[in-house]
Amino acid sequence: MSTQFRKSNHNSHSSKKLNPALKSKIDTLTELFPDWTSDDLIDIVQEYDDLETIIDKITSGAVTRWDEVKKPAKKEKYEKKEQQHSYVPQQHLPNPEDDITYKSSNNSNSFTSTKHNSSNNYTQARNKKKVQTPRAHTTGKHVNLDKGKHVPSKPVSNTTSWAAAVSVDTKHDVPQDSNDNNNEELEAQGQQAQEKNQEKEQEEQQQQEGHNNKEEHKQIEQPSLSSKKTTSRTSASQPKKMSWAAIATPKPKAVKKTESPLENVAELKKEISDIKKDDQKSEASEEKVNEQETSAQEQEEETAEPSEENEDRVPEVDGEEVQEEAEKKEQVKEEEQTAEELEQEQDNVAAPEEEVTVVEEKVEISAVISEPPEDQANTVPQPQQQSQQPQQPQQPQQPQQPQQPQQQQQPQQPQQPQQQLQQQQQQQQQPVQAQAQAQEEQLSQNYYTQQQQQQYAQQQHQLQQQYLSQQQQYAQQQQQHPQPQSQQPQSQQSPQSQKQGNNVAAQQYYMYQNQFPGYSYPGMFDSQGYAYGQQYQQLAQNNAQTSGNANQYNFQQGYGQAGANTAAANLTSAAAAAAASPATAHAQPQQQQPYGGSFMPYYAHFYQQSFPYGQPQYGVAGQYPYQLPKNNYNYYQTQNGQEQQSPNQGVAQHSEDSQQKQSQQQQQQQPQGQPQPEVQMQNGQPVNPQQQMQFQQYYQFQQQQQQAAAAAAAAAQQGVPYGYNGYDYNSKNSRGFY
């Protein structure tokens, strides 16, 4: 044997170089073939990589253990001969564990393990591979060839679980080498293994008798079709073996096996054709049942006759009660049916099993031609019941379906006027209520209903209500400190107002942004109403007015944060010069979540903020493809060009910006239905009229400038793709793409 030679080569160093992969293979193999030591397996594992091929070789006997050869004692020889005589016809049958697909009605002995039966007891390892694909077998009977002992092997059907079949196999089915005439010498090698196996089997049988007593008495009086002549042997003394996995599977099939000789293959073939006919019958009967059920849908209260063999009558009535009653009746009747059939079969053993197989699952029929004992016959009809049950509920439900849409439509109609009412109420409340109270109601409407008719309205939609109180205090302080360009008023602003603004901003932040943190789609910010950047706009605006530190928000303000805010921020932090070069601003600590407020790690918000371009967050100025072209360039303007400082605007204008905000808000509140007195009385003190004039003039001037800038940008940028030099993120033309 070449394996012997190889063994002597490898064995010396094999133990040293067992890498974990080999070791795991060897472990699984030793579990499958306990009588192989790891030394025996090492060579095979080294020679063949694939576990399946190794198992194949061992089970087919192409590879054997290097073992002592003993001559069989006379007694053993005599026993074997007797056995072989009694079993001669069975050589035409497959040893179920040997033939992978159970197909061979032809000579499957070409690779039965019995030639090298040192490995014979684990042929089922082969099964283990194939259990997932059970075939419709040409030979349905699996006959287990054990010395005079009946070990029912487990039929592999689609309904038994893979684990169940395998575990049953590996634990119990130990095919003995009974069906080879010619290999007596080789058989002698495995006698020790056989004796061990037989002892094991006896122990296991004793353990399992407790489990199987129930099945036993059902099996006793049912010798199966082919055992007409040898009914003297029943399987009562050897109950079916089941592993825990088999017991756990939903329908343990206790299928009785006989080991009596089958006279010829022709008989088998006849049986198989019978069974195919039965399949067709059962299918046809199921179809009839379905047809009847559909007709029963039209005449609901009449009774249809749905049953496997059209014997039972299940009255159909509306409602869910029908289903339950029908299920119960069917189960009861089927149990009675199967019991009757089994009695009939016991009377005439030779009768073919058509009646039972009609009720059985088709899978079971093709897999095993043996009678099901009672408990199987009871469990098998369940799938068919299940197939009928879904059809039964359809009958009462169908007439109801047309009603359901009507019901759905009715509630919808009242809802719509309700919504309109709510909107009207909200609109009526706006002029009446104080702004702090109106804030929440107006939020949604501000986003979607207000037009940007004025340049600053675009940026200040919601701010007008929410920050009014702050701005009032701010304006009041401006009057106390008449020098309009001083930075003190803002930094001295009362902490209370700062707190209010922060609360509002936080509330709004959570209201919109956190719902769908990473969600974006390309045109998302096209509509002015979309509340994405507005949150930051408020946050930063708040900071710009309440404290001087808003410079930090210069590049982190989200998309809506526009020039006016940052201009004010630059002014208040006395950083106008510094902020003119973006690099200093990056160095500021980040106080907001980096990518536009809702952190999405992938591609840095590919659509919203396309990472390298818009907001270089990380303080390295030279790293990005181009630098920020403008001082307060914010990537994604949700509002059309608000107050973008064109390069020629000086710091003087920046300083005026900060004041301009209040006046603009006050002016815009009038068209939006905010009563004028409320605006003019800020905390009980009237607005300085001179201030208001100043604001108005500047507002007009800046609007002109901006229209010009926007027109230029639109002309220049028409059709230029995204990353290029003059790209103006404030202009509407460029907005949808990136």
Swiss-Prot record:
Gene: DEF1
Organism: Saccharomyces cerevisiae (strain ATCC 204508 / S288c)
CDD domains the UniProt entry points to: CUE_DEF1_like
Modified residue annotations for Phosphothreonine: T338
Extra remark beyond the main annotation: Present with 3380 molecules/cell in log phase SD medium.
Gene Ontology terms: cellular component: chromatin; chromosome, telomeric region; cytoplasm; nucleus
Positions of modified residues (Phosphoserine): S260, S273, S307, S646
Stretches the record annotates as Contains the proteolytic activation cleavage site: 500-530
UniProt similarity note: Belongs to the DEF1 family.
Skewed-composition ranges (Low complexity): 103-121, 224-237, 380-455, 467-498, 660-688
Superkingdom of the organism of origin: Eukaryota
Domain notes: The C-terminal part appears to promote nuclear export.
Protein name as catalogued: RNA polymerase II degradation factor 1
GO annotation, biological process: DNA damage response; positive regulation of transcription initiation by RNA polymerase II; protein ubiquitination; regulation of protein complex stability; telomere maintenance; transcription-coupled nucleotide-excision repair; ubiquitin-dependent protein catabolic process
GO terms of molecular function: DNA binding; transcription factor TFIIH holo complex binding; ubiquitin binding
